[in-house]
Amino acid sequence: MAPNECEAGDGGCDTGGAAGSRRGRAVSGANAGAAPLLRATGLHAHYGESHILHGIDLSIGPGEAVGLLGRNGMGKSTLIRTLMGHVRAAAGTLAVRGADALALRPDQIARLGLAYVPEGRGIFPNLSVRENLLMAARAGSDGRRDWTLERVLAAFPRLAQRIGHGGQQLSGGEQQMLAIGRALLTNPDLLILDEATEGLAPFIVDEIWRIVAAVRASGIATLVVDRNYRSVLSHTDRAVVLEKGRVVWTGPSAVALADQALLVRYLGV
């Protein structure tokens, strides 16, 4: 069996070792059998001379919540940046809503219904909260406008209180809320969060996860990377574990959370 392949079954899939007897690929119950929103096959990517991704296969269904796990340096952020077009894949295929997206620019991929909140937030410090939000507002890929400025401000009361403040006047947690709110105003089909809670105060972290849960409940698919694996697994349907740029385990998040041997082996916890 190739390192990134899983066979059909009820549990998780591990390519070897203590968990190697489990087989299967989790599918969100409500969307089992639905055409994938995103499908990547055989993705390879490099940074300079370094070969980072080695034949990654990943699919995400409509409304599915997926947690991307692995130790630091295993390729999680590179995979996300490759999916968004910021890193050019050296080989493989990428389809978003059935459209070939491998050669598209990041803005073109975003127009297909993907929204990305990177590490570092990327807000505009000289624009107000209102301006930061409104510059991103648009209808979704199917024309819907479920997430409006009013809905984002209701979800993030702190932003409503600072609506006229410049981005540079916000705390780190408020800037992260602004970045997520701006992404939601694109009315995405898939929201990708890369280390959304890193370095934030615990009460802000709780607020971020509350919003992640609300986004999931609204039917938007999510792909989440975060160092707090317990929170990731508690807010997702399925886990995908990377090691050295390869998928080494995929299965239900609840299975991963209950498997201490798996967590020790691949996350070092």
Regions found by a protein language model. Name each.
Residues 84:
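Helix-to-loop junction immediately C-terminal to a conserved catalytic motif
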Residues 166-170, 174:
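Conserved ABC ATPase signature
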Residues 48, 66, 104, 129-147, ...:
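ABC-type ATPase nucleotide-binding domains, specifically the catalytic core motifs of the NBD
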